[in-house]
Amino acid sequence: MVAERAGHQWCLFLDRDGVINRQVVGDYVRNWRQFEWLPGAARALKKLRAWAPYIVVVTNQQGVGAGLMSAVDVMVIHRHLQMQLASDGVLIDGFQVCPHHRSQRCGCRKPRPGLVLDWLRRHPDSEPLLSIVVGDSLSDLELAHNVAAAAGACASVQIGGASSGGVADASFDSLWEFAVAVGHARGERG
């Protein structure tokens, strides 16, 4: 998964809640005060940035569609996230957000591939066959499968302890653990 991407343009698509930040059980991260980094996530993004030509956050935010928060609230959270990472030299190349409630039949809500395919269309230098989706839920892994069906290939990495039923190409306890494994495969020490 690591060596074959060296020297190529490709994208690492990351879920947000449950991968980068702590998920609010039974609710949504509605504002920056509720955003809580998962341990090691910011360091992991720095390490992954050295490997991945593009990093894009892909997230369902149905709290917008339910009227519990606005699209501006989500943008403010992402702006703060971006500013914190930028202070450490880390750039997120994009945030692809589905604001629709699950009852709506949009093409962008994960596991549908609309958000990823839209980003890939707008970035033709990125090789779709080398894309990787990283997430903590079955819908994230299904997203990778759906992107593969549309684009020809897409690897999946599961974060967290929930069983994927063997659907993921790789599984790690945290984004940090994934980043360390990538670093080791790239010959990094520490």
UniProtKB/Swiss-Prot annotation:
Main localization category: cytoplasm
Involved pathway(s): Nucleotide-sugar biosynthesis; GDP-D-glycero-alpha-D-manno-heptose biosynthesis; GDP-D-glycero-alpha-D-manno-heptose from D-glycero-alpha-D-manno-heptose 7-phosphate: step 2/3
One Gene Ontology molecular-function label: zinc ion binding
Residues that coordinate or bind Mg(2+): 15, 17, 136
Keyword Kinase among UniProt keywords: no
Active site: residue positions: 15, 17
A biological process from GO: carbohydrate metabolic process
Transmembrane segments: none
A cellular component term, taken from the record's GO annotations: cytoplasm
Compartment annotation: Cytoplasm
Keyword Zinc: yes
Family listed: Belongs to the GmhB family.
Official protein name in the record: D-glycero-alpha-D-manno-heptose-1,7-bisphosphate 7-phosphatase
Protein's organism: Mycobacterium bovis (strain ATCC BAA-935 / AF2122/97)
Source organism phylogeny: Bacteria, Bacillati, Actinomycetota, Actinomycetes, Mycobacteriales
